Amino acid sequence: MPLSRLIINDFRNITTCDIQLSSGFNFVIGPNGSGKTSVLEAIYLLGHGRSFKSSLTGRIIRNDCDELFIHGRFTTPEQFELPIGINKQRDGTTEVKIGGESGQKLAQLAKVLPLQLIHPEGFELVTDGPKFRRAFIDWGVFHVEPAFYDAWSRVKRLTKQRNALLKTANSYRELSYWDLELAQLSEKIDQWRVDYINHISEATQQICQAFLPEYDIKLSYYRGWDRETPYAELLKKNFERDKQLGYTVGGPNKADLRIKVAGTPVEDVLSRGQLKLMVCALRLAQGQHLTEATGKQCIYLIDDFASELDSHRRQLLAQYLKQTKAQVFISSITAEQIADMHDDESKMFEIEHGKIAQG
């Protein structure tokens, strides 16, 4: 479902804006420091309940203001208008509205607004620790498997309880009750993740063939413990070691997605421009699977589109984004950098000092 309207109040350097959006490409053009990234950040906040640039609410609320508001309107497949909104206050209080109803959860907001972000710091997906790739996998599973969110939340609570018990337990018997449910849920989560990676691997490789034809890129999934060992057996076997360490060593919270070229991690082979295309391929494959599995379209947020990409690679990425028929928001310093993508269906917005005007 594309956003048809976006209203931003007191976010970063934006006092207020109210813009009508294209269901296709939307370009936000402006010099560095103008606020163009803030527009994408506001949309991300609307879908995730948090910023991708700061974890501190006080830093994203405009100076001398006590709260921020971001509102959006969707056009549903039935052509109804669905309003959504988020309000954040300096004390950390957050209120979410969906369809005019207050008290909604952030997970519900994320479900109705599936967003994919590609930004200059996005290399962390392939270059940094496993937590970024787990988040990547779990974003996808969350959107296609309705039971995932509750199951994963329960696993995290059970693991926390288990870690607390490890500090006082004298025998494994004291943990066996908790471990039974933990093992069952962990195996279920693992299977959902396996199925998901199997679904997106082929799409990722196909997109990589277009973006990076000189490389044969392979994805492999590590579940967080030995593939041949049932998790219940591992928990019992590792009790003494876990007790000594004070936490549970293996489990679904240690899962990883390994991305390699001829057996070598991609970050040791690809240039920065190629790594950006690798990240784009992963995000686009997720969006493709989301549409195939649910009928929903991703919304793509691409901050600093031209960064790390030469004109040929920019053109490749733009062509693929157009093929998705998804709604896309792109920030750029100059209109020349995105001239080839602009058409009659797209909209261009110029921003300077936090003030937005349609170009």
Curated annotation (Swiss-Prot):
GO terms for molecular function: ATP binding; single-stranded DNA binding. GO terms for cellular component: cytoplasm. Keywords: ATP-binding, Cytoplasm, DNA damage, DNA repair, DNA replication, DNA-binding, Nucleotide-binding, SOS response. Pfam families: SMC_N. It is found in: Cytoplasm. It comes from the Bacteria. ATP binds at G30, P31, N32, G33, S34, G35, K36, T37. One of its GO terms (biological process) is SOS response. The keyword Ribosomal protein does not apply. The RecF protein is involved in DNA metabolism; it is required for DNA replication and normal SOS inducibility. RecF binds preferentially to single-stranded, linear DNA. It also seems to bind ATP. Belongs to the RecF family. HAMAP family: RecF (MF_00365). This is DNA replication and repair protein RecF. It comes from Aliivibrio fischeri (strain ATCC 700601 / ES114) (Vibrio fischeri).
